[in-house]
From Swiss-Prot:
Gene Ontology annotations for the cellular component aspect, listed alphabetically: plasma membrane
Protein name: Taste receptor type 2 member 2
GO MF annotations, alphabetized: bitter taste receptor activity; G protein-coupled receptor activity
Annotated TM spans: 11-31, 57-77, 80-100, 103-123, 130-150, 186-206, 235-255
Function: Bitter taste receptor that detects natural and synthetic bitter compounds.
Pfam families from the UniProt entry: TAS2R
Gene3D superfamilies xrefs: Rhodopsin 7-helix transmembrane proteins
Residue intervals annotated with topology Cytoplasmic: 32-56, 101-102, 151-185, 256-277
Organism of provenance: Homo sapiens (Human)
Extracellular side: 1-10, 78-79, 124-129, 207-234
Length: 303
């Protein structure tokens, strides 16, 4: 079977994203597991980062399997990828990745923002204890979404598009299908809304803090200002990956793009950039992770 230029380009992009994603997410898992072995316990943020690494690792594997079948086994793609088992895994890892990213943004917002409201301060001092419960809630929410999603007969819907020739029938089927998909995935808008709110709060907090510093210390930037800026850079980068994945994911689930077209493969590439790029930013924004990653690279070079 001859491969189109779009398919070849997709293979190259996916291979690069897959290798990057497996490396950086595997690193997050290994580093935190090593800390667990050494100290017999983990800080809440370390647990969160390890969970993020595991969820990204799983999502990267699922997306790679999808790409493999779409390129090399197109006839089996619909039956395998939109079957109950693979659909459950895809929806579960997509949902839990978004929820864990939201938990991380909440952590940054509570720890760094300078709001003094009583409710905010109450959450700020209790966030370490709340993280395990947030992670458990994320898992339960993701399992629920994935369980509902497998009830939608995706494979049948996609095959109907290929078999039907009547424009009216095809349009009715497509409208029904999109309605089902959007209804099922409506729950994913909730973590997106929380993420946007946390990013906005960090922006407001940075503006207020900078304004106070300019009037009180003639523009001197202290450690708190640097923490605000670094956290904001990280969260905004997260936000870009978050939005791009969410938009590509929702577009993909409407089946509006021609199968194996250039746009189809591009959508898959955008989705695969999220679990790898997101974790790269986590490592780059943490000096300890940077040092550990450099040490691992040096060991590999010596070997």
């Amino acid at each position: 079977m001859a491969l189109s230029f779009s398919a070849i380009l997709h293979i190259i992009m996916m291979s690069a994203e897959f290798f990057t994603g497996i490396t950086v997410n595997g690193f997050l898992i290994i580093v935190n597991c090593n800390e667990l072995i050494k100290h017999r316990k983990l800080m809440p943020i370390q647990i969160l980062l390890m969970c993020i690494g595991m969820s990204r690792f799983g999502l990267q594997m699922v997306l790679m399997v999808q790409s493999f079948f779409s390129v090399f086994f197109p006839l089996l793609y619909v039956k395998i990828i939109y079957g109950a088992a693979m659909m459950f895994l895809w929806m579960f890892f997509s949902s839990i990745s978004l929820w864990f990213a939201t938990c991380l943004s909440v952590f940054y917002c509570l720890k760094i923002s300078g709001f003094t409201q009583s409710c905010f301060l109450w959450l700020k001092f209790r966030i370490p204890k709340l993280i395990p419960w947030l992670l458990l809630g994320s898992v339960l929410a993701s399992v629920s979404i994935a369980s509902v999603c497998i009830e939608v007969d995706y494979a049948k819907n996609v095959e109907e598009d290929a078999l039907r020739n009547t424009t009216l029938k095809k349009s009715k089927t497509k409208i029904k299908k999109i309605s089902e998909v959007l209804l099922v995935n409506l729950a994913l808008i909730f973590p997106l809304a929380i993420f946007v709110m946390c990013t906005s709060m960090l922006l407001i907090s940075l503006y207020k803090h900078t304004h106070r510093m300019q009037h009180g210390s003639h523009g001197f930037r202290n450690a708190n200002t640097e923490a605000h800026i670094n956290a904001l850079k990280t969260v905004i980068t997260f936000f870009c990956f978050f939005i791009s994945y969410f938009a590509a994911f929702m577009t993909n689930m409407t089946f509006s793009l021609p199968y194996r077209s250039h746009q189809f493969f591009m959508l898959k590439d955008i989705m695969a950039a999220y679990p790898s790029g997101h974790s790269v930013i986590i490592i780059l924004s943490n000096s300890k992770f940077q040092q550990s990653f450099r040490r691992i690279l040096c060991l590999k070079k010596k070997l």
